[in-house]
Curated annotation (Swiss-Prot):
Role noted for this protein: May be involved in environmental stress response.
Region named Disordered: 48-81, 150-173
Coiled coil keyword on record: no
Protein name: Zinc finger AN1 domain-containing stress-associated protein 13
Molecular function (Gene Ontology), one example: zinc ion binding
Top-level division of the source organism's lineage: Eukaryota
Residue spans, zinc finger AN1-type: 170-216
Amino acid sequence: MVLSGRGMLDGGADDVGLWLGMQDFLVFCESAMYATCPLCGLFSDSPKEGRSGGGGGSEGQRTDSRLQLPTTSIVDSPGKRSLCVRASDGAGERDAGRAAAAPVRERLWLLRLCQHPRPLLQVLPRQPPPDRDVPGAVVIVVHGASRRGTVPEGIPVDEGAMPPPPPPRAKTKSRCAACGRRVGLMGFECRCGAVFCGAHPLLGQARLWLRLQGRAGRDAIARANPVVSADKVDKL
């Protein structure tokens, strides 16, 4: 880095932020007859009042144009753009302004991070465990907003006050015991417990049970009503 007598920047722009500190860089900007920006700390385009005289009108204007380091808009932090916008005369001057503002921008961004650090992990509040010392009680914990008909959070409920669970529903037979076809409402259930369809009315134990019942009934009827045989009629 080479500085002339009037404070012009003739060397590499990256050496400004490395060799000089933040305060030295601001002092250097003030010595170059330019005001510093209160937002980003960089010097603006317009020179300070009372210092732009120097050595005559035409020579002072040439000095101002030579000392000016035009840059584009500077990003101080992610998502925020600075208000210091300066016009550039050429591609070379624009690149030099960007390189000169890069170390200052990085230092300001690191300074903001150190002043307002953010936690890496979010700490969630820990809920207390339920009370296990109370015998014969159940603690119901409801997360979130309580609805109508629910128990509030942390209230012990006695087991005797809770209604008993409903009995299991009995499974009905809906298939024929002979062919396995679904019968629905058309099937009929025998006394033995089996369900049959219309094509297989009585099979297996049901037929045997009815046969035994019929035989016993016939025997009872025969005993109660003896057979009466009439005499044969002579043929004419």
